UniProtKB/Swiss-Prot annotation:
The chain crosses the membrane at residues 61-81. This is Uncharacterized protein C11orf87 homolog. Residues 24-60 are extracellular. Residues 172-181 have a biased composition (Low complexity). The lineage of its organism: Eukaryota, Metazoa, Chordata, Craniata, Vertebrata. It is a single-pass type I membrane protein. One of its GO terms (cellular component) is membrane. Keywords: Glycoprotein, Membrane, Signal, Transmembrane, Transmembrane helix. It comes from Rattus norvegicus (Rat). Residues 95-106, 124-135 have a biased composition (Basic and acidic residues). Residues 82-196 are cytoplasmic.
Length: 196
């Protein structure tokens, strides 16, 4: 074991330090010339040790710099990819919104105003018809429903009485029935039917 330890020390230490340590062990006392020579050798030994340490540190430093550069390149490429992807998404959203606005505006300016009113009027008419059905049925009689069933095929009467009046009939009984149905709160229904 004692023989292996000096061999390991010799491998770890530079040769100048090994020579100096062995020289100090072998020589118990030396002259001034020996001290000067050992001092000069010590200076060169320090430079040799510094060079070896610098070489080892420089190699590790170069490796560290290379690894950091590669890591920075990867991070930079990923960040630019994500930024570019976000910009493309924003551009697509803007283009889609512009196309939607163009289609919307062209549909409204190109004569789409009247069909929209026509589309909205029947829905409003349906709501008012459903809301006012009990009132209309309360004021109208079943005889009016039979006379006005053939008035307009577009409207469906869900109650016992049809809200639109029949065409003008020469008999006074038909005119009276039409006036009684017109006086009911279903006048809005007639207006929505006429508008649509």
């Amino acid at each position: 074991m004692s023989a292996r330890a000096p061999k390991e020390l010799r491998l770890a230490l530079p040769p100048c330090l090994l020579n100096r340590t062995f020289a100090s062990h072998n020589a118990s006392g030396g002259s001034n010339a020996g001290i000067r020579s050992s001092g000069a050798g010590g200076g060169t030994c320090i430079t040799q040790v510094g060079q070896q340490l610098f070489q080892s540190f420089s190699s590790t430093l170069v490796l560290i710099v290379l690894v950091t550069l590669i890591f920075c390149l990867i991070v930079l490429s990923l960040s630019t990819f994500h930024i570019h992807k976000r910009r493309m998404k924003k551009r697509k959203m803007q283009r889609a919104q512009e196309e939607y606005e163009r289609d919307h505006c062209s549909g409204s300016h190109g004569g789409g105003g009247l069909p929209r009113a026509g589309v909205q009027a029947p829905t409003h008419g349906k709501e008012t018809r459903l809301e006012r059905q009990p009132r209309d049925s309360a004021f109208c009689t079943p005889s009016n429903a039979t006379s006005s069933s053939s008035s307009s095929p577009g409207l469906l009467c869900q109650g016992p009485c049809a809200p639109p009046p029949p065409p003008p009939v020469p008999s006074p009984h038909g005119a009276h029935a039409a006036s009684s149905c017109l006086d009911t709160p279903g006048e809005g229904l007639l207006q929505t039917v006429v508008l649509s």
